[in-house]
Amino acid sequence: MAAPARTPRSRILGCSSMLRFLRNLVGSKGGSKSTNKPLTRSQPSSSWEQDVVSPMMGHQGGRGRKEPRAKVHSAASSNGKREPPPRVLSAAPSNPRHDAFELGTGDSGSQTLTSKDVPKLRAQGVEVTSVPLRGTWEVLEQLPEKKGEEEEPVGEVSGASDREHFGQALETEQGCLQWVPGPLALTPGAFIKEEEDEHCPIEFGDLKPSSCKVGSTPWNYLLGLYKQLQKSAMAKAQRPAAPQLALKDGLPHEEKGEREEAVDESCPKWCAPRASSDESCPKWCAPRASTYQSPLQKKFRSTDTVGFVESELKKILSVQREARLWKVGNPEGRELLTQPDITLEEAGMVDGQHLLLEEMDEMGNWPPPD
């Protein structure tokens, strides 16, 4: 029986099967090269489009349709936010199709997909893989460097701010623990309470308060010091001053034998001679400490008697009891002047000697000798 003649359709199918076989062989050897084509051809740009047309085998071995375009945007969008890097999605069926010769179709089943087609293919059991482009890798490599450069000044600013906060906290803590000298802060409340507060007693020797209130302010301390000084000045002004008396016996100063007797109320019994330019006219004064600003003065003549000098000294010193006069300064010791009729010259009074007026006490006894 003769074999049936081939129809034109069977010839077309046989040629197409042979072409697919050859294409699969070529595709399996150059598969790695074909996958790198998008990486070598892609360049980093703000916006670019890529059209991928892949043959897709149908149930009857026909050529597949053209897939829609997949747009990949740059890493930085127009609004300033970073978008995920563009990727080329390729899908391969889990069960690859076989031709009439039971040979696999190779890369003919892989195709470029959009993000909308990925869920549909995953639901059908198709494996979906993403391949980043070269431009994407370049952008991703530059991003960490820029991020590091941006983090360095931010870190420096944050470090400086942390140091400032730490310094302020440390100063606040030290201000609470230590007292820092500075200008006095005067508040109006100090003027209102100045009459109510008790002033601190002041020691004028070193100008330090002996006892003060715990809540007293520097203003109250200064005010109390001022008032204490003011009171002391007023007390000195109100104290009666000692009268400076110049008792004269009516004799001229040029007369020879004139003697000056200075008497002090605090030590009324002592009289000391004071040398003058004229040896014939010795002057007498009280050598002891005095509370008066200036001692009382009395002038005597060398011819005045001892009784006259004693009576005058009693009047000046306000002596009411019995008294006696001593001559002090002799090499032999002090000498009692018992003769009131002799003169001072006859008594041997010379320069460097003293007269001592001794008063009897209330019991009628003389003070014991030194």
From Swiss-Prot:
Which residue ranges does the record annotate as region Disordered?
26-114, 240-263
List all disulphide bridges recorded for this chain: none
Identify the keywords attached in UniProt to this record, alphabetized: Cytoplasm, Developmental protein, Differentiation, Golgi apparatus, Membrane, Mitochondrion, Spermatogenesis
Report the membrane topology from the UniProt record. Answer: Peripheral membrane protein
Tissue specificity statement from the Swiss-Prot or TrEMBL entry: Testis-specific. In the testis, expressed only in germ cells and not in somatic cells. Expression starts in late primary spermatocytes in stage X-XII tubules and gradually increases towards step 1-3 spermatids in stage I-III tubules. Expression then declines continuously and disappears after step 7 spermatids in stage VII tubules (at protein level).
Q: Return the InterPro entries for the record.
A: Ub_USP-typ
Give positions of region: Required for induction of mitochondrial fragmentation: 225-370
Q: Where is the protein situated, by its record's location annotation?
A: Cytoplasm; Membrane; Golgi apparatus; Mitochondrion intermembrane space
Protein name, per record:
Gametogenetin-binding protein 1
Q: Which gene encodes it?
A: Ggnbp1
